[in-house]
């Protein structure tokens, strides 16, 4: 790669941001970060515990700080948390400091991928996870679209196909690869 440019993955929970991000980083020889994992590393606690103790507002403040710091690096792939786009500052940083890839995933796939994951505080205790995901999509989808340079559907394709599709699009818009 002539120019090391950051790649930021956004999208709802269960879109495959971490899985896809790791594979992109591996193929392009970039460093991979996951904002949720970074928060867990820094706090020494699971996201659900941070949510329980500090509420969503406290968690979002931590997330914003992590995104601010990580986006200052060059040559990284960052999988962001699904709600990271709720912060205007984070949206601005992501847009200004790299290529934003929106992994678009239907509610059905999100449900299938997240139904047994107790580490997702917004749906773990929900009576109706589908309704929660639909409400989150209504609120967040326009924000993902607002900052996306590339949008890729992740519902029916394999991770390998999605990764190759993203890399091809990155090469065409940026000369990456």
Swiss-Prot record:
InterPro entries cross-referenced by the UniProt entry: P-loop_NTPase, Shikimate/glucono_kinase, Shikimate_kinase/TSH1, Shikimate_kinase_CS
Catalytic activity: shikimate + ATP = 3-phosphoshikimate + ADP + H(+)
Cofactor annotation: Mg(2+)
EC primary class: transferase
Residues annotated for ATP binding in this entry: 14-19, 120, 157
Main location (coarse class): cytoplasm
Keyword annotations of the record: Amino-acid biosynthesis, Aromatic amino acid biosynthesis, ATP-binding, Cytoplasm, Kinase, Magnesium, Metal-binding, Nucleotide-binding, Transferase
Cell compartment(s), UniProt: Cytoplasm
Record family assignment: Belongs to the shikimate kinase family.
Record's function text: Catalyzes the specific phosphorylation of the 3-hydroxyl group of shikimic acid using ATP as a cosubstrate.
Protein name: Shikimate kinase
């Amino acid at each position: 790669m002539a120019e090391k440019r950051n790649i930021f993955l956004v999208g709802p929970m269960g879109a495959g941001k971490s899985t896809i991000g790791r594979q992109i980083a591996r193929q392009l020889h970039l460093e991979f970060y996951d904002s949720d994992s970074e928060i867990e590393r820094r706090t020494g606690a699971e996201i659900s515990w941070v949510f329980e103790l500090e509420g969503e507002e406290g968690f979002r403040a931590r997330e914003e700080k992590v995104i601010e710091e990580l986006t200052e690096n060059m040559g990284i792939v960052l999988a962001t948390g699904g709600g990271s786009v709720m912060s205007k500052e984070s949206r601005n940083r992501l847009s200004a400091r790299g290529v934003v890839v929106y992994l678009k995933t239907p509610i059905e796939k999100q449900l299938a991928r997240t139904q047994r994951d107790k580490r997702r505080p917004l749906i773990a205790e929900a009576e109706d996870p589908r309704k929660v995901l639909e409400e989150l999509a209504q609120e967040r989808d326009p924000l993902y679209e607002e900052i996306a340079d590339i949008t890729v559907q992740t519902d029916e394709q394999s991770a390998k196909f999605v990764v190759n599709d993203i890399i091809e699009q990155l090469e065409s818009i940026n000369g990456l690869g």
